[in-house]
Amino acid sequence: MRLVNLILLLIALVFFVWVLNELGWDTLGHYLWEVGWYWPLLLLPYGVVNAVVSWAWKHIIINPPAKVTVARLFWLRLGGDALNQLTPTASLGGEPFKAVRLQADGVPLEVASASVVIMKGILFLSLTLYIFTGLALAPVFLPQTAKHMLLLSLAALGLAAVGIAFVALQRRGPCGNSFRFLSRRGWLPHFLRDREGFLEDLDTAMSQFYRQYPARAVMSFLLFFLSWLIHAAEVYVIFWLLGC
C-alpha cells in the first residue's frame, strides 16, 4: 500500500508541475509578487473549508470508532477529492476510496458507504441554498443581473428539485429496488449478483440515518452551508489582494 501511495504521489507531483508550467512560471510569479510574502495564507481558507466539511461528515457517521476523528476524515476527504480531480469520473472516483478507507478504520462498509452517499446529497442541498442566497443578494450588488433573474431562479429551482429528489430517494431503498428491477429483467451485472445483502444493508443505513438522526442531518447541512460561505470569502479575499 505504501508503494501505491508513493506512485500516486509521484503522478500527482508530475501533474502539478505540468499545470504550473502550462500556467506559466512568469505569470505565477507575477501574481505571487502582487499578493506579497504572505501569499501562503491564501492556502488557509481551503484548509478551513475542508475541516468544516469533515466535521459535517463526522455528524453523518453513526457511532464511529475512536480513530475516526475529524482530523482523519480531513485527510480522507483530501485523498478522495484528489482522486476525483485526477480521474474522469464526474467527481465520483474518490468516493469508493473514502468508503474503503473508513472500513479499514473499523466502520462497517455499509455505514461508510451510506455516509458518503448521504454526504453527497446533503452537500448538494446546501449548495442550492448557497445559490439562492447569491441570487437574493445579486440585485443589491449586481443590479445588471436583474434581467436574467427569472432564468437564474428557474435553474436554481431545478437544481433544488434534483437535490431534494436525491435525498428523498435515499430513504426509499434505492439500491435494493434497483437490484430487484434489474434482476427481474435479466439486466443485472454479474459483479452485483452476490451483493444483494450488502445493498439492502446500505439502504437500511441511509434510511435509518434520516429517520433516527434528523438533528445530525440538519447540523451537517448547516456546516456544509458554512463551508460554501467560507469559499465565497476566500474568493473575495484573493481578488482583493490582487487588486481586482
What does each model-found stretch correspond to?
Residues 1-30, 80-189:
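Transmembrane helix-loop-helix hairpins in multi-pass inner-membrane proteins
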Residues 2, 34-42, 208-221:
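Membrane-interface helix starts
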Residues 27-35, 66-69, 105-106, 205-213:
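Helix-boundary and loop/linker segments of multi-pass membrane transporters
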Residues 44, 48, 79, 118-125, ...:
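Hydrophobic residues within alpha-helical transmembrane segments
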Residues 48-55, 60-62, 85-96:
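Short helix-coil transition sites and intra-membrane helix breaks within transmembrane domains
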Residues 52-79, 238-244:
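Membrane-embedded helical hairpins/re-entrant loop segments and their flanking transmembrane helices
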Residues 123-130, 201-202, 224-235:
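Core segments of transmembrane alpha-helices
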Residues 184-202:
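Short, membrane-interfacial amphipathic segments enriched in basic
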